[in-house]
From Swiss-Prot:
Belongs to the DNA glycosylase MPG family. HAMAP family: 3MGH. It comes from Listeria monocytogenes serovar 1/2a (strain ATCC BAA-679 / EGD-e). One of its GO terms (molecular function) is alkylbase DNA N-glycosylase activity. The lineage of its organism: Bacteria, Bacillati, Bacillota, Bacilli, Bacillales. Coiled coil: none annotated. InterPro entries: Formyl_transferase-like_C_sf, MPG, MPG_sf. This is Putative 3-methyladenine DNA glycosylase.
């Protein structure tokens, strides 16, 4: 097992830095069926009170967003279109910023169980989207409020991307200037990026 990411790592960085720096890290979920895991290849940063695209815009505090005001490394799960999405809180208590995990590259030894969790989906379809990866990993709303440092979900050091690309976030229309923030970060060339074009897929994406 590689070195696990600590709370101190989260506390030493901004939300945007974290969204970039966790690319290539291994996301692990310990389940009754064993360890399910993959390398993070796509994230989005959400900047809280000043970000119209964030659930916590203007410090909106509801039953759903309450956990966003918790400490760094807390897990924020929410449902959208029958899918469950995974986010990590990034800033000190009271500053509701987060990272959405949008895609992972599944680890080979976990693919069989992850394929079962995805009802037979294989190839890039296995984990090339935020709802797909949570289903593949067996994550659910029951993981809301856990932390990455004392639960069955954690991050490990793994690989470093050759190139990271920053683009507009997906699915945030009509959010004023926030619609155009370049806060989506991807490992350039990864076939598992959501909506990836075939002619954009590259080999040798890791250092």
């Amino acid at each position: 097992m590689e070195a696990m990411i600590t709370k101190e790592f989260f506390e030493s960085k901004t939300t945007i830095e974290l969204a970039r720096d966790i690319l290539g890290m291994r996301l692990v979920h310990q389940t009754n069926e064993g360890l399910l895991s993959g390398l993070i290849v796509e994230t989005e940063a959400y900047l809280g009170a000043t970000d119209m695209a964030a659930h916590s815009f203007q410090n909106l505090r509801t039953k759903r967003t309450e956990v966003m005001f918790s400490s760094p490394g807390t897990i924020y799960m929410y449902q959208m279109h029958r899918q469950v999405l995974l986010n990590f809180i990034t800033m000190p208590k009271g500053i509701p910023e987060a990272i959405l995990i949008r895609a992972i590259e599944p680890d080979e030894q976990a693919k069989q169980q992850m394929t079962q969790n995805r009802h037979g989906k294989t190839g890039y379809e296995l984990t090339n989207g935020p709802g797909k990866l949570t289903q593949a990993l067996g994550l659910s709303m029951q993981d809301y409020g856990k932390t990455l440092f004392d639960s069955n979900i954690w991050l490990e050091e793994a690989k470093l991307p050759h190139l990271i690309e920053a683009t507009n976030r997906i699915g945030v229309p009509n959010k004023g200037i926030a619609t155009h923030y370049p806060l989506r970060f991807t490992v350039k060339g990864s076939p598992y990026i959501s909506g990836q074009r075939k002619n954009s897929i590259r080999t040798g994406i890791w250092k």
